[in-house]
């Protein structure tokens, strides 16, 4: 698969994608308004952000009982983003089994030009048809190997090869739980770079659950990653994503060219993105437990909701989710865990 038609300015060392309007949807419980999306896209575009991702937190078709309903239909937000951006390309996420081929076509018709297809890191084979369709439609393609911390670099590279052979132009090491630590990122990115060669680029998507989003992203770039994700103000699931404004500051200092103006992106984060956030993304006990136990970052809000519903500690829910090795799409099992903890509490109270 050729990487020649990837949107990549020769002056860049790395292409940045801001995921505030997709990963940030988890933190906002998918309640973005058109005004918020329009203002954020305009600010990111003006700062020089090459790619802006816009969709429900769980991708196309994610608005549902299981994941949470969108306040504004995602296709309307994709269209608005594409109409607002002057230079930035609009990307959209889709998960096989959640989104459909019709969703992909509609997103393209609404102005999306980069299709990012995500699977669990051991299930790349379920994305083959989706990559084929996206390339047939003329879309640029990106693959997400989620929960990449759960398998070895060698196994991850084999999964990346499946995506690349199917038409994926850049395969991401996705640290969905924010559980990877420095060398763990470098080893995985290096393995993918060695496997894919010129067939596809390699990217990295980090979270801040152990406070390593920026450091891990630097490790990824030094290991050969050409695409990096982040969110302004860490606006994302769990403790949030690597903050774009901090990434740009660090990249400037170490000589990594991105085409993004540091002062403009810092202004966008402070003056435009922050007011749209329901609260800051915190590196609190719940987030730390997710990073430490390897829990999918979008579980945070679901765990808090079940904690309030059943009167059990959210951090205990998250820790047990990690022990069970739950993955994205299994959020409903938090109810079973909550009931399990509740029964244990009642039994202990009876013994007392």
Curated annotation (Swiss-Prot):
Binding sites annotated in the UniProt record for substrate: 22-23, 176, 205, 296
Keywords carried by this UniProt record: Aromatic hydrocarbons catabolism, Lyase, Manganese, Metal-binding
Entry superkingdom: Bacteria
Pfam families: DmpG_comm (PF07836), HMGL-like (PF00682)
One example GO MF annotation: 2-isopropylmalate synthase activity
Residues covered by the Pyruvate carboxyltransferase domain: 14-266
Catalysed transformations (reactions): (S)-4-hydroxy-2-oxopentanoate = acetaldehyde + pyruvate
Amino acids binding Mn(2+): 23, 205, 207
PROSITE patterns in alphabetical order: PYR_CT
UniProt-annotated site: Transition state stabilizer, residues: 22
InterPro entries per UniProt: 2-IPM_HCS-like (IPR050073), 4OH_2_O-val_aldolase (IPR017629), Aldolase_TIM (IPR013785), DmpG_comm (IPR012425), DRE_TIM_HOA (IPR035685), PYR_CT (IPR000891)
Enzyme class at the top of the EC tree: lyase
GO biological process: catabolic process; L-leucine biosynthetic process
Signal peptide positions (record): none
EC number: 4.1.3.39
Active site (record annotation): 26
Protein family (similarity comment): Belongs to the 4-hydroxy-2-oxovalerate aldolase family.
Protein name: 4-hydroxy-2-oxovalerate aldolase
Organism: Mycolicibacterium gilvum (strain PYR-GCK) (Mycobacterium gilvum (strain PYR-GCK))
């Amino acid at each position: 698969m050729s990487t020649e038609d990837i949107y990549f300015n020769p002056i860049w060392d790395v292409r940045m994608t801001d995921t505030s309007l997709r990963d940030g949807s988890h933190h906002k419980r998918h309640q973005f308004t058109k005004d918020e999306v329009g203002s954020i896209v305009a600010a990111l575009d003006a700062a020089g952000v090459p790619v802006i991702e816009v969709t429900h937190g769980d991708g196309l078709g994610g608005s549902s009982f299981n994941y949470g309903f969108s306040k504004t239909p995602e296709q309307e937000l994709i269209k608005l983003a594409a109409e607002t951006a002057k230079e930035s390309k609009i990307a959209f996420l889709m998960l096989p089994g959640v989104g459909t081929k019709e969703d992909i076509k509609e997103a393209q018709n609404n102005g999306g030009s980069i299709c990012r297809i995500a699977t669990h890191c051991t299930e790349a084979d379920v994305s083959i048809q989706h990559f084929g369709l996206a390339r047939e439609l003329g879309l640029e393609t990106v693959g997400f190997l989620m929960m990449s911390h759960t398998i070895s670099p060698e196994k991850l590279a084999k999964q990346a090869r499946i995506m690349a052979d199917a038409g994926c132009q850049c395969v991401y090491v996705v640290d969905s739980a924010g559980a990877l630590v420095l060398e763990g990122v470098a080893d995985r990115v290096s393995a993918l770079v060695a496997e894919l060669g010129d067939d596809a680029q390699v990217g990295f998507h980090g979270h801040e659950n152990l406070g390593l989003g920026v450091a891990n992203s630097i490790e990824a770039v030094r290991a050969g990653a050409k695409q990096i994700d982040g969110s302004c103000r860490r606006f994302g699931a769990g403790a949030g994503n690597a903050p774009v404004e901090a990434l740009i500051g660090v990249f400037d200092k170490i000589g990594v060219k991105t085409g993004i103006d540091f002062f403009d992106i810092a202004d966008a984060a402070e003056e435009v993105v922050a007011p749209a956030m329901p609260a800051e993304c915190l590196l609190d006990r719940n987030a730390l437990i997710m990073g430490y136990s390897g829990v999918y970052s979008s579980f945070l809000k679901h765990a808090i909701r079940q904690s309030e519903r059943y009167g059990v500690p959210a951090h205990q829910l998250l820790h047990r989710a990690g022990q069970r090795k739950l993955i994205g799409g299994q959020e409903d099992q938090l109810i079973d865990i909550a009931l399990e903890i509740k029964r244990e509490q009642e039994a202990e109270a009876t013994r007392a």
